Every structure is written in structure tokens, then in C-alpha cells.
């Protein structure tokens, strides 16, 4: 039924969905996948969820990928600061013992990975 609406109306209605609901809706049919993957929709969701400014351009891989990367980075940062705030020695020990692998994302959403030891030994 919603597929029979004009694409602009459907896209406007979908702006009220959150991240997980939008992802679930995109798996219901091919027309919903096309509508739910609209770049304008993901741009609006990005600015609704995050108040950070971008560099003013369009992300290389689109707003959906940029949203997913930003959400993942925010989740990891929240977990990190939660562990530090808890001042729990076991949680901090686990963090430091398992933190040798690093993932970084630049502004365009490009992923860089590597191990913490990226400089020559002295």
C-alpha cells in the first residue's frame, strides 16, 4: 500500500523512522529497499541523530554508509568512556589487553585498520 504513494511522500513519511526500523523496512520488498536507501533520507537521519558538522561535501560512499560508520564510532567511544568512568580494574584490564587492533575512519567513511604498533621500535 505504501508503495503506491508518490516517492516524495513515501520518503517524507520514512523520515520519522529510526535507524533499525529503516533497515528492517528496506528488507521487506525491492521497492521499499530502493526508497529506504535514498541518500536524502539518510542525510536527514544523520543530522537528526548526530549534531556534528561534516566537511560540507557529500560522503564518498553515500549518507547511509556515513551514518553507519558514525554510529559505530560513537558506540565504540561510548563503550570506551563507560569503561573509564566505571574505574573497574577488570574492565580496564580487559580493554587494554584486547585493544591492540585499531580501526579508524576518516571523514569520508574510508576504513583504515592496523595494529597499534605502527612505528619502528627505538
UniProtKB/Swiss-Prot annotation:
It holds the Pfam family F-box-like. Residues 1-45 form the F-box domain. This is Probable F-box protein At4g23960. The lineage of its organism: Eukaryota, Viridiplantae, Streptophyta, Embryophyta, Tracheophyta.
Amino acid at each position: 500500500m505504501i508503495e503506491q504513494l508518490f516517492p516524495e511522500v513515501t520518503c517524507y513519511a520514512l523520515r520519522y523512522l529510526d535507524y533499525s526500523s529503516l533497515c528492517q523496512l528496506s528488507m521487506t520488498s525491492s521497492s521499499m529497499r530502493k526508497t529506504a536507501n535514498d541518500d536524502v533520507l539518510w542525510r536527514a537521519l544523520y543530522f537528526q541523530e548526530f549534531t556534528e558538522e561534516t566537511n560540507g561535501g557529500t560522503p564518498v560512499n553515500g549518507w547511509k554508509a556515513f551514518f553507519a560508520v558514525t554510529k559505530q564510532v560513537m558506540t565504540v567511544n561510548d563503550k570506551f568512556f563507560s569503561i573509564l568512568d566505571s574505574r573497574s580494574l577488570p574492565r580496564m584490564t580487559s580493554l587494554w589487553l584486547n585493544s591492540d587492533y585499531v580501526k579508524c575512519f576518516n571523514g569520508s567513511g574510508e576504513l583504515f585498520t592496523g595494529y597499534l604498533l605502527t612505528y619502528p621500535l627505538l
